[in-house]
């Protein structure tokens, strides 16, 4: 049975959505559930993300944000999960790692960032289907500005949820005298999106409800996945946005703009 963390507290109850997969390190997958208020972006963060920091109070964007934030407390699908795996091989020159005989084409940049790792945490996290449903409804109504803002709030929400999971992982690993890397996702930092298939294969059945399409896109739409390196001698590297080819990356927007 995996551990469950609800509202910051850990329990041994079984989620209705399914069971996780035992870790080969003797540990177990850990499931997190959050209320929107626990991971909600601030008003300032939303305005900064959509590059609208100097709007008047009566601007439609400001009015919409004030109206929609309380509604998002109805979102019960914000959740995340990670499972620990041994890092069997890392070939820096080839930009490859191997986990349970499955190769990942991380590229030399990311391999360099986790070259001291001996284990990895494979993760998934979602802001839930509620964001997708509301955004689709707004688009159908022709409320394009509102749909764009809600999409931005969803992006920020899932990242803030993953921030909390990463911090929890950091604390747990410190107890084992292990350090962690930043988190990295397929489709970012020059890591091919196609590696999503292998990532989900290793994560296995989990209670987040995230599904992967044949084109490697996740549903619910506001979901993230990836890995975090773990190791005693691991060094924390900043994201290499200056040498990354992805000009639309959410991390570039959050960290540097």
Regions found by a protein language model. Give the residues of each.
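Active-site helix-to-loop segments that bind/position phosphate- or nucleotide-bearing substrates
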Residues: 2-9, 29-147
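Glycine-biased, low-complexity coil/linker segments
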Residues: 17-20, 24-28
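Structural signal for hydrophobic packing residues in well-ordered secondary-structure cores
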Residues: 69-76, 169, 173, 245-248
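Internal, well-folded beta-alpha domain core
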Residues: 142-202
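Short terminal or interdomain "cap/linker" segment that borders an active site or interface and mediates
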Residues: 176-251
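Short cysteine/histidine-rich zinc-coordinating motifs and their immediately flanking basic loops
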Residues: 253-257
